[in-house]
């Protein structure tokens, strides 16, 4: 696992916020995002922002934002019902570049938390985890994704 510690500035995002099991809400949210970005010709980096620990929070209470990164002065276009603006906080993040080709987007996350984090010298900090999709693998099934965990030095 090749993890880098990076400093990220605050990022403004636009997209959809859903609550429920991620295996249901992530595809639903990205379908909504595809339709919205196509309708309004909006482009930007694609991300999933995750709120809640799936090992501690009941699946029906997990939250996800399916979003694109937008400029700081971006405003939602007319006819954007259901879309919202959000902020990914600035901070220190552990970033892991992964390749997914089997449709299992959870496996690299669990490996990141279970294999890297415990002996890394870092602990998870306040804030959401998120992933940044570097390509559209919807046709090929091949995805390159940056996974981000907010971290601080362990004491």
UniProtKB/Swiss-Prot annotation:
Keyword hit for Plastid: no
Keyword Cytoplasm part of the UniProt annotation: yes
GO cellular component annotations of the record: cytoplasm
Pfam family for this entry, one: GyrI-like
Keywords carried by this UniProt record: Cytoplasm, Stress response
Gene: sbmC
Name of the protein in question: DNA gyrase inhibitor
Subcellular location(s) per record: Cytoplasm
A GO molecular-function descriptor: DNA topoisomerase type II (double strand cut, ATP-hydrolyzing) inhibitor activity
Function summary: Inhibits the supercoiling activity of DNA gyrase. Acts by inhibiting DNA gyrase at an early step, prior to (or at the step of) binding of DNA by the gyrase. It protects cells against toxins that target DNA gyrase, by inhibiting activity of these toxins and reducing the formation of lethal double-strand breaks in the cell.
Similarity remark: Belongs to the DNA gyrase inhibitor family.
Domain of life: Bacteria
The protein's assembly and partners: Interacts with DNA gyrase.
Organism from which the protein derives: Erwinia billingiae (strain Eb661)
């Amino acid at each position: 696992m090749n993890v880098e510690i990076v400093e990220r500035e605050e990022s403004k995002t636009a997209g959809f916020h859903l609550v429920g099991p991620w295996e249901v809400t992530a595809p639903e949210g990205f379908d909504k995002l595809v339709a919205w970005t196509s309708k309004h010709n909006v482009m930007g980096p694609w991300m999933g922002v995750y709120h809640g620990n799936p090992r501690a929070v009941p699946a029906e209470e997990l939250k996800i934002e399916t979003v694109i990164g937008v400029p700081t002065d971006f405003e939602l276009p007319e006819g954007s019902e259901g879309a919202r603006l959000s902020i990914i906080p600035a901070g220190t993040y552990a970033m892991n570049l992964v390749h997914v080709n089997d449709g299992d987007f959870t496996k690299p996350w669990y490996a990141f938390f279970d294999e890297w984090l415990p002996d890394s010298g870092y602990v998870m900090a306040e804030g959401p985890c998120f992933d940044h999709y570097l390509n559209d693998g919807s046709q090929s099934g091949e995805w390159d994704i940056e996974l981000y965990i907010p971290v601080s030095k362990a004491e």
